[in-house]
């Protein structure tokens, strides 16, 4: 895919940071030596880690140069680098691996979680949050529009698959865990109409669908996409629409 846009991503910074705050609140580590933000984005989640553990060595990495550039401006004292979770290996001092909305992009993410856990010392924590929204109308609509005659040839079969069942995560990780906490949360974000929903997903889920298209085709796709999802997001009494957004959380403390 093309590079991520930090500017587009940060249009809904507070809403995107809330799951990171909720994940952070459940990490059972008081005084970590080293904390790593996997897929740190523009640094909004890293900032939360610095605030909770000001004495720790906090760092972050991301595959996107644009995201890393923005993160360095936001937190100039934090070490940010371009990197990929698939090749990352934590060192012996790492007490917390934190990841907000990254692992869902990896088809083998359970394998990667097990690999990272195997490299952590006992008592260290892997904390992960992933969107679990492939069945939501935002994402069903993406695929439906991509299948239409106007776009099928260029877009093809895009988007990631649904996440595995919770039991699959539990069975895969329990053998390495002294403590394993898994839960779902469904957020209902009040947004300023369907246009705002489109702006939200343009930064993330829509990217694989838009990247193969030229500028005019992108405009046509977005018009068709908006028309496809609009009936599923009725307007509330105050003019808002509610974006339903399920997410799964995992906090694994190494045995």
UniProtKB/Swiss-Prot annotation:
InterPro entries linked: SAM-dependent_MTases_sf, Trans-aconitate_MeTrfase, Trans_acon_MeTrfase_C
EC number(s) in its UniProt entry? Answer: 2.1.1.144
Q: Which family does it belong to?
A: Belongs to the methyltransferase superfamily. Tam family.
Catalyses which reaction(s): trans-aconitate + S-adenosyl-L-methionine = (E)-3-(methoxycarbonyl)pent-2-enedioate + S-adenosyl-L-homocysteine
Instruction: Tell me where it resides.
Output: Cytoplasm
* Name the UniProt record assigns to this protein: Trans-aconitate 2-methyltransferase
User: Which cellular component, as a GO term, is one annotated location?
Assistant: cytoplasm
What organism is the protein native to?
Brucella anthropi (strain ATCC 49188 / DSM 6882 / CCUG 24695 / JCM 21032 / LMG 3331 / NBRC 15819 / NCTC 12168 / Alc 37) (Ochrobactrum anthropi)
Disulfide bond entries: none
Keyword Cytoplasm assigned to the entry: answer is: yes
GO biological process terms held by the UniProt record: methylation
* Annotated function: Catalyzes the S-adenosylmethionine monomethyl esterification of trans-aconitate.
The first-level EC class reads transferase
